[in-house]
Amino acid sequence: MDENKKRALSAALSQIEKQFGKGSVMRMGDRVIEAVEVIPTGSLMLDIALGIGGLPKGRVVEIYGPESSGKTTLTLQAIAECQKLGGTAAFIDAEHALDPIYAAKLGVNVDDLLLSQPDTGEQALEIADMLVRSSSVDIVVIDSVAALTPKAEIEGEMGDQLPGLQARLMSQALRKLTGNIKRSNTLVVFINQLRMKIGVMMPGQSPEVTTGGNALKFYASVRLDIRRIGAIKKGDEIIGNQTKIKVVKNKLAPPFKQVITEILYGEGISREGELIDMGVEAKLVDKAGAWYSYGDERIGQGKDNARGYLRDNPQVAIKLEAELREKFQPAEAPREAGETESE
């Protein structure tokens, strides 16, 4: 590219960033766009794929996928990580389906978790807004957008046609919420479901659509698509799901990265399984036939035994994780001269 074009592009990029904010346009090769506070997801693979080490605070995040794909599990693990760091978490259970026993198994301190089971969509979003405005809650999870039923629909008859009511509710709520979220530096996670568009027959066009209109797609800084792609077996018994998570949108680092991880029943995302898979990829763990070795030590025949070894020897798992983080996680981008900590 000649110098005139370079200067013109540089001026255009700086004008775009000035007008629309940092991260609104980026080169795909850029590793880290801005240093931002994050809450780890509980999945090392996903933290690295997100490019910033977790879910960004002060932003809206949408997690969507088919039923039983691991959406709520992922958010509960993020809540557990937030609590480990001394943060406060709130769960707005519009589906009225949260299982506190399962949440506790994933590491959530259910005694300290703020829980709301609202009657209407307006009530749910108003509670979320009040928690955000308090500036004392680190993460608010809303489960799910599909269950945010407008008051008019609840008070109406069963067969009433009320088109676009939920989409208008979401659009209005997000307009109100986003400024408060940024000011309070709270992470707000919306869980969403998928529906099928009727009559979509165009090649290459997906018939799947998320509920609640288009507003959330625009306001979300990060969108994650999570899907079950297979079963994990121990002999003939199915002990978990193999899950693919794709970063569909990311305003803070290059998007479209995807990871394949394991969600074990009653345990959540398998930290040890991820360490083994990433260790093999990074050539830190050697796989010869069915045997896995780390350093000079054999850690197990078959992945399940290797996973058990790391679980029984946490110091080995911590050492391997530290090496993997050093290898995979990008270092913080150096600040330019004159750039201040707070924008």
From Swiss-Prot:
Gene Ontology biological-process annotations: DNA recombination; DNA repair; SOS response
GO cellular component entries: cytoplasm
Classification via CDD domains: RecA (cd00983)
One Gene Ontology molecular-function label: damaged DNA binding
Subcellular location: Cytoplasm
Main location: cytoplasm
Annotated positions binding ATP: G65, P66, E67, S68, S69, G70, K71, T72
InterPro entries found in the cross-reference section: AAA+_ATPase, DNA_recomb/repair_RecA, DNA_recomb/repair_RecA_CS, P-loop_NTPase, RecA-like_C, RecA-like_N, RecA_ATP-bd, RecA_C_sf
Disulfide bridge partners, by residue number: none
The keyword Mitochondrion belongs to this UniProt entry's keyword annotation: no
Keywords, comma-separated and alphabetical: ATP-binding, Cytoplasm, DNA damage, DNA recombination, DNA repair, DNA-binding, Nucleotide-binding, SOS response
Keyword flag Repeat: no
Function: Can catalyze the hydrolysis of ATP in the presence of single-stranded DNA, the ATP-dependent uptake of single-stranded DNA by duplex DNA, and the ATP-dependent hybridization of homologous single-stranded DNAs. It interacts with LexA causing its activation and leading to its autocatalytic cleavage.
Family to which the UniProt record says this protein belongs: Belongs to the RecA family.
NCBIfam families: tigrfam_recA (TIGR02012)
Protein name: Protein RecA
Organism expressing this protein natively: Xanthomonas campestris pv. campestris (strain ATCC 33913 / DSM 3586 / NCPPB 528 / LMG 568 / P 25)
Encoding gene, per UniProt annotation: recA
